[in-house]
UniProtKB/Swiss-Prot annotation:
This is Probable multidrug resistance protein NorM. The gene is norM. Pfam families: MatE. NCBIfam families: matE. The keyword Metal-binding does not apply. The keyword Transmembrane helix applies.
Length: 452
């Protein structure tokens, strides 16, 4: 990142920041995408098992990686305020925290996964695949969380192209292992959905190893000497980190877990409905990578400018991010409307699943505008380190408005499973409105401070 003086310079720098993040997020998502689509071509049962397992795993992983994402605004503001010497201590403490969080998640999962799956009254093969999927994914938690911290450090320096290269190097490993283990090609065992979990776990370890090597050997990362000194764990540093990270993580958790909760509630419907819902939701999540990437770029850009006390510049980056998100939302809405048949065909060859997935995809169109506002706005707020109010707003919008409304519509109206999608759409709309109002308040506060 560097200081800019004109809107066109900011737009260029933001796009150069955003594009590698977008490629990185698409590559990471591609692992889940290939897990889902390739499992679906193995059988509807494998697809449903992976869907249930993913619906339990994703909210946990995204919530905790969200906490660790606090690395990005902290380092960005340190770099913006010329305090480079403080960066290694922050990163190492975050790594310690990531490892501790990994062990806590594994321990809790050991006790709660089986009761959760048993209580869902799933078909036996689906429950078995989901349980095995989660057991294997647990082996990849430590590298995934540690990588999240190191990626936050790399991105905060504005070197998002580096994380793009790392994930592009790792993605083929995931795809090849999926091909070998899901379908049993070239003499490997045919493991179905379980093979997808093994492939993802192996890829997480590869990503971590590549990242550590780059930080140790390549500039500008090597000059920070991140691993030169293993600082003692600092409780005060952890608390300061968590004060920022926990609201970020829980805000992300509230948003992602509502989608997972809906998928789990779908267990009351048929395997066909679960599979169709997962296919449509998976593609909607693919499109979500764009506003998510814009949000990450906004956190870096806004954090850098706030650290340098250039608050008008920070505000302009917010406008750029939201404007780009709305443009992409329009494009994706057109894509969903005209190519729903082709999109559904990516996920399944089963006629019933295909037909129902097309109906769910139409609802996904209405996600686009809300995501285009809410997600980038949260990214900007993180750059300002304003995260507590956003946490409350997402809780209200998604869990107090969206999910209960979806349950009522699905249970007591003829909408059935589609009622959950309507509830999600309304919850996301409220969330977008709440968060946008908060961003305006924060920007006004900083602009007023700057004018004094």
């Amino acid at each position: 990142m560097k200081e800019t003086t004109s809107f066109s310079q900011k737009l260029k720098q933001f796009v150069l920041l955003f594009f590698p993040i977008f490629v990185t997020q698409m590559s990471l998502f591609a692992m889940s995408f290939f897990d889902t689509t390739m499992s679906g071509h193995a059988s509807p049962t494998d697809l449903s098992g992976v869907a249930i397992g993913t619906s339990i795993w994703i909210p946990v992983s995204t919530g905790l990686t969200g906490i660790l994402m606090a690395t990005t605004p902290i380092v960005a503001q340190l770099v913006g305020s010329k305090k480079k010497e403080d960066v290694p201590h922050v990163v190492i403490q975050a790594v310690y925290l990531a490892i501790c969080a990994s062990f806590v998640v594994i321990l809790i999962g050991f006790f709660v996964v089986s009761p959760i799956l048993n209580g869902m009254r799933l078909e036996e093969p689906v429950e078995r695949i989901a349980a095995q999927f989660l057991s294997i994914i647990a082996i990849g938690i430590i590298p995934l969380f540690t990588y999240t911290v190191l990626r936050g450090f790399i991105d905060a320096l504005g070197k998002t192209r580096t994380t793009m290269i790392i994930t592009l190097l790792s993605l083929p490993i995931n795809v090849i292992l999926n091909y070998l283990l899901i379908f049993g090609n070239f003499g490997f065992p045919k493991l179905g959905g379980v093979g997808a979990a093994i492939a993802s776990t192996a890829t997480y370890w590869c990503i971590l190893i590549i990242t550590v090597i780059i930080i140790q050997t390549k500039e500008p990362f090597a000059s920070f000497n991140i691993f030169k000194q293993l600082y003692r764990p600092s409780l005060s540093s952890w608390i300061a980190f968590l004060k920022l990270g926990v609201p970020i993580g829980f805000a992300i958790f509230f948003e992602t877990s509502i989608f997972a909760a809906v998928t789990l509630m779908m267990s009351n419907f048929s395997t066909t409905t679960i599979a169709a819902h997962q296919a449509a939701m998976n593609f909607a999540s693919l499109l979500y990578m764009t506003p998510l990437s814009l949000a990450m770029a906004m956190t870096i850009a806004v954090g850098f400018e706030v650290g340098a006390k250039r608050y008008d510049n920070a505000k302009q980056y917010g406008l750029i991010g939201i404007g780009l998100a709305l443009a992409f939302a329009l494009l994706y809405s057109i894509l969903l409307y005209f190519f729903d048949d082709q999109i559904a065909s990516i996920y399944t060859t089963d006629a019933k699943v295909h037909h129902l997935a097309k109906e769910f995809l139409i609802f996904a169109i209405l996600f686009q505008i809300s995501d285009a506002i809410a997600t980038p706005v949260q990214g900007a707020l993180r750059g300002y380190k304003d995260v507590n109010v956003a946490l409350i707003m997402t809780l209200i919008a998604y869990w107090i408005i969206g999910l209960p409304l979806g349950y009522i519509l699905a249970t007591y109206t003829e909408w059935a499973a589609k009622g959950y999608w309507i509830g999600l759409i309304i919850g996301l709309a409220f969330g977008a409105a709440f968060l946008l109002i908060r961003l305006f308040q924060v920007q006004r506060k900083y602009t007023t401070q700057n004018s004094r």
